[in-house]
């Protein structure tokens, strides 16, 4: 699952993503190797502690982040929040949370892009495009396989931001301007 809709009202869209089952499986698998090495080794307790701590450290590095996206029309802001357990432990609970705040009026488009994921093929991620030309992914990691899940979230976000209505309006204006200019050329 790419992102789940936590809550949706006329003025608020709250999306949330938790670490995937693959991420939790890697955490358990790598931690199990450390525990097995400590249990079956004949080394001192200090080395056994090193085995467990080292594998736990590597396992936490592979754990995906918790991510939230809050789009609020009342405040006119989009807040993208990322929580990382690994960073929180490294900074002794002082860090681990990154936050990006942008104005909703600066978001120009919402796209689904394919991203290469090392060793696993390709994944999909939603990218927010801003009027300044900058692009920012909605989440830090791509989801493998199911493009339809990502497209469903992108469609929900597009509908909430009313890009489907806004996108058709300028095109209609351009068409009317083209027909007016064609009529002006015909009269000359």
From Swiss-Prot:
Pfam families to which the protein is assigned, alphabetical: Cybc1_Eros
Superkingdom to which the source organism belongs: Eukaryota
GO cellular component, one term: endoplasmic reticulum membrane
The UniProt record lists the keyword Transmembrane: yes
Subcellular location: Endoplasmic reticulum membrane
The keyword Transmembrane helix appears for this protein: yes
Keyword terms, alphabetized: Chaperone, Endoplasmic reticulum, Immunity, Innate immunity, Membrane, Transmembrane, Transmembrane helix
InterPro entries: Cybc1
Transmembrane segments: 20-42
Membrane topology: Single-pass membrane protein
A GO biological process held by the record: respiratory burst after phagocytosis
Role description: Functions as a chaperone necessary for a stable expression of the CYBA and CYBB subunits of the cytochrome b-245 heterodimer.
Family: Belongs to the CYBC1 family.
Protein name, entry field: Cytochrome b-245 chaperone 1 homolog
Organism field: Xenopus tropicalis
Encoding gene (name): cybc1
């Amino acid at each position: 699952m790419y992102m789940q809709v936590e809550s949706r009202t006329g003025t608020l869209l709250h999306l949330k993503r938790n670490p995937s089952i693959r991420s939790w499986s890697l955490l358990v698998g790598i931690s199990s190797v450390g525990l097995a090495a400590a249990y079956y080794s004949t080394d001192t307790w200090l080395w056994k502690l090193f085995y467990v701590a080292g594998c736990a450290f590597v396992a936490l590095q592979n754990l995906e982040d918790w991510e939230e996206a809050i789009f609020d029309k009342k405040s006119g802001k989009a807040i993208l929040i990322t929580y990382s357990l690994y960073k929180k432990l490294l900074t002794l609970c002082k860090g681990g949370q990154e936050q990006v705040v942008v104005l909703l009026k600066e978001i120009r488009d919402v796209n689904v892009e394919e991203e290469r994921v090392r060793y696993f093929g390709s994944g999909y991620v939603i990218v927010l495009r801003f009027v300044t030309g900058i692009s920012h992914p909605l989440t830090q990691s791509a989801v493998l396989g199911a493009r339809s899940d990502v497209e469903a979230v992108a469609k929900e976000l597009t509908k909430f931001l009313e890009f489907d209505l806004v996108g058709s309006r300028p095109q209609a204006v351009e068409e009317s301007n083209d027909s007016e200019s064609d009529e002006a050329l015909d009269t000359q």
